[in-house]
Regions:
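C-terminal regulatory/oligomerization modules of transcriptional regulators
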Residues: 1, 49, 127-158
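Pre-recognition alpha-helix immediately N-terminal to the DNA-recognition helix
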Residues: 6, 10, 17, 21, ...
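Short, locally clustered residues in the helix-turn-helix/winged-helix DNA-binding domain
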Residues: 15, 40-47, 110, 137
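N-terminal helix-turn-helix DNA-binding core of bacterial DNA-binding proteins
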Residues: 20-68, 151
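Charged, amphipathic alpha-helical coiled-coil/dimerization segments
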Residues: 74-134
Length: 158
């Protein structure tokens, strides 16, 4: 009996391979994959939204515990990717600010993600690649993922 592979199997396999490749490349910048995601979120809030970010924002956005966020941020600070500043409005909050090192790493991370996108669509025409993106967004929304979440985007979306 010839069974076709499940769609979720394809998605899982692609996600695993892409995640491993991304992790290896991001590590050359001195970041873990989680730190890379945090870096992008903080960058996005600073650059695109014009807002500051604190640990609580990251906890809520990524749906993870304070202790996890705190550990990641402390390691990022120790590595020179960000600084903390006490909020003038609420002294319990510490705003996160990216350093120049972080901005440089972010630019490299965007390039790495663009390379991954190009690899995913290498055998597709431009129209097929656009349709693939549209279908991925629909599928993501169907399972409760915000398809327009603030993660690095391809060159066409920037």
């Amino acid at each position: 009996m010839n069974r076709e592979r499940s769609l979720s199997g394809y998605v899982r396999s692609m996600a695993n391979v892409l995640s491993q490749q991304l992790g290896q490349k991001v590590e050359t910048l001195g970041l873990t994959p989680a730190q890379g995601m945090f870096l992008h979120r903080i960058w996005y809030c600073e650059t695109e939204l014009g807002t500051t970010t604190c640990a609580k924002d990251l906890e809520q956005f990524f749906h993870i515990r304070h202790s996890t966020v705190s550990g990641i941020l402390q390691r990022m600070e120790a590595a020179g990717f960000l600084t903390f500043a006490v909020s003038e409005a609420d002294h319990r909050r510490k705003h996160l600010t990216l350093t120049q090192k972080a901005h440089d790493a972010h630019a490299q991370t965007v390039k790495i993600i663009q390379e991954s996108d190009a690899l995913l669509t290498a055998r597709m025409t431009e129209a097929e690649a656009a349709e693939f993106r549209r279908l991925l967004q629909l599928a993501a929304e169907s399972v409760g993922v915000d398809a327009r979440a603030t993660f690095p985007q391809s060159a066409k979306e920037e």
